C-alpha cells in the first residue's frame, strides 16, 4: 500500500534526494542508499549491499574535502569559479548535522583564490603566516622604539646643553636674602661712639641725630651700632657677674659695673618700677660706700700706716682671750 500510494519513507527520500548526477535508469538506487551517500565524495562506492554509517560518511567528508570538486558526476555542472566542493556537498546531501556543518568549514589558510587552471592554490601553513606577521610587527615596533628613544635622548641632551648655557650666562639663584655690606667705621668714629656709649647706654632720637651728623654717619648706622654694642655689653656683664659671684669679689664687681646694678638698696626699693628704667639713661653715678668691706683689716691697717695700733681682732669661739703684755 505504501509502494502504490508513493508515501513510503523510501520513496519520499528518493524523490527529495534526487540529483542530476545520479543515473536515471536505476530507480532503486535511492532506496538502498542513505542521504549521506548521495554526495559526490561517495559516488566511487556504487555497491548498495553495504551502506556506510553516518559517522563514517562524516569522517570521509572531513578527510576528503579538498578533492571533492573533481567528482565524475559534477564535472559537467561545475565551472572553475562557481561553487566550492563543501558548498556543493551541502546542497546535494541537505545534511544539517553539526558534524557535517563543522566538516564543511574551511580553515582560513585554505580560502585562497583558485588558479587559472581551475585547481586550488596550495595554501601556506597558518603557523608560517602568523610567524611572518609577528616578525613584521616586531620589526616595526623595534624601529618605532629605537626612533622614540633616539628622539628622547636628543631632547634630553639639548635641554641639558640649554641649562648649562643658561647657567653660564646668568648668575646662580640665591635662596637666602643677600646680606648688606657692613659699615666700615674709622678709628675716630669708633672712639666717639665708645665715648658716647660710656656716657649713655640709650640715646634719644635727638641725641642720635646729633651724633650721626657730627660723625658724618646716617641715623640708621648709629642706631644699629648702639644695638650691637648694648648686646655685647649685656653679654659681658652677665659673664662677669657669674665669674665674680663665684670668686666672691664684690668690691671689684662694684668698681667694674657701678651702674645700674649697685645702687643702694634703699634707693632702688623706693623707686617706682617704671622710673627705675631711667637709671640706664642717666650718667653713671659714683660708686657708693662699701657697706661690708671684704678686705681683711690687717691689710687696711698696713695701708693706713704703722703709727696707729691695729684694732683688736674679734675673739674666736672656744679660745680664751689673753691679757696684753707690756713691751
UniProtKB/Swiss-Prot annotation:
It comes from the Eukaryota. CDD domains: homeodomain (cd00086). Keywords: DNA-binding, Homeobox, Nucleus, Transcription, Transcription regulation. Pfam families: Homeodomain. Residues 33-54 have a biased composition (Low complexity). Residues 133-143, 152-166 have a biased composition (Basic and acidic residues). Gene3D superfamilies: Homeodomain-like (1.10.10.60). InterPro entries: HD (IPR001356), HD_metazoa (IPR020479), Homeobox_CS (IPR017970), Homeobox_TF (IPR050848), Homeodomain-like_sf (IPR009057). One of its GO terms (cellular component) is nucleus. Its main location: nucleus. Residues 308-318 have a biased composition (Pro residues). Residues 1-90, 113-181, 303-327 are annotated as: Disordered. Residues 79-90 have a biased composition (Polar residues). It is found in: Nucleus. Residues 178-237 bind DNA. One of its GO terms (biological process) is neuron migration. SUPFAM superfamilies: Homeodomain-like (SSF46689). One of its GO terms (molecular function) is RNA polymerase II transcription regulatory region sequence-specific DNA binding. Belongs to the BAR homeobox family. This is BarH-like 1 homeobox protein. It comes from Rattus norvegicus.
